Amino acid sequence: MIASINNRTKLNFFHLLVTMFRIYPNNTTVPGCLVGDIIQVRYKDVSHIRFLSDYLSLMPNVAIVNEYGPNNQLVIKRKNKSLKSLQDLCLDKIAVSLKKPFRQLKSLNAVCLMRDIIFSLGLPIIFNPALLQRKVPQRSVGYFMNSKLERFANCDRGHVVEEKQLQSNLYIDYFCMICGLNVFKIKE
């Protein structure tokens, strides 16, 4: 998405030049209003073009607004509030496709195996911990398994683990939040 500002910048009003190559080969110009850091686009300006409101609502700094809400106020119109960007949508799609071999993660070894599969996908390194956090259940490691584990304050790459993470017994807390490597070792 490329924003081109016209001569009415004093009113914080400009036209968005939206390029959707696969859906429409030509550029589409949409009027928008800059409010703070968010570009507000009226729903009636984009409702006549198929998929355009959905495409714009995936942008993190664009809000689709409906003027005809209660008390004539602007009401932000978003279909899915949990997805804020195209990157989040792609990560959720990958997380759903990874769900099939791992229906239940009952041990830390199964989580490590799933983590290795995530690493083998070839995604950029910054996406691996985010995808791991989406897939690992918010459940604690059992007392018997926890007594066999030794936890570290640093991962193998030298990233420091927070004190709050060391005190918690959730599955995700046994992995580095920056790179996704183990911060534990099984005692012998």
Swiss-Prot record:
Domain of life from the UniProt record: Viruses
Pfam families, per database record: DUF7879
Protein's name according to its UniProt entry: Uncharacterized 21.7 kDa protein in GP41-PNK intergenic region
